[in-house]
């Protein structure tokens, strides 16, 4: 059966695509992360199977309901773990994935002939890998990540706030700046305990799929405003600024607790500056955010 192996940060991921949803052609966003094999049993494995989907008990209310670029996503408890449902378009029948309690194994049931199969597989991989990463002291964050002078900066905020606009201001304002990921970068501590930002296959409309990394230097939560202002955050305020950006099941108390502990570990690194950036879509906002997040580098 077709098996595809990837390395995202230092976390291995295997996809067993029995129905050939990918038609034996790896999507462009996964190619930079492809590896020959994933060594050892400690890896995330998602198996795609063309089998009868599980049944959602009639009348059972979902534990959560999310509307975003993936479609409509529901979460249910299941005797085998956690059942994730995605309806890519209004009126679509749900496609289902079962994640086991360890968050290291999952099965997606979708037909190889499903016209939305590749989209569903990509979406479910993102959901599954986010939970797996949280069990390994890493987090996928909803942010746009930019690198400059060997350091990474994350810009977070609600959809439509201007995260991508702001990182592109950096690219256009500061020579040498480049986008690491435009939607869902991975943050993971390296062997020295330094939080590091990695590219991932999931980058929204920006299509920035780069297998690169840089140490995390700063995080800013963006809010549109008529004037530019940076408000530094520490302690609980810094934690609250980052928390909404994680993609972890709150229904699993242990997993959510691990994710919160990981955020605190990242924020305890003295090199990481956090704050809220009230900003305009102008170059002045990029100049302010750089001078606030990395004052010694902006001289």
Residue ranges and their predicted role:
Residues 1-159, 169-178, 185-299:
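A noncatalytic interaction/capping subdomain that flanks phosphate/NTP-handling catalytic cores
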Residues 166:
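Hydrophobic positions on the alpha1 helix immediately C-terminal to the Walker A/P-loop
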Residues 163:
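Conserved lysine of the Walker
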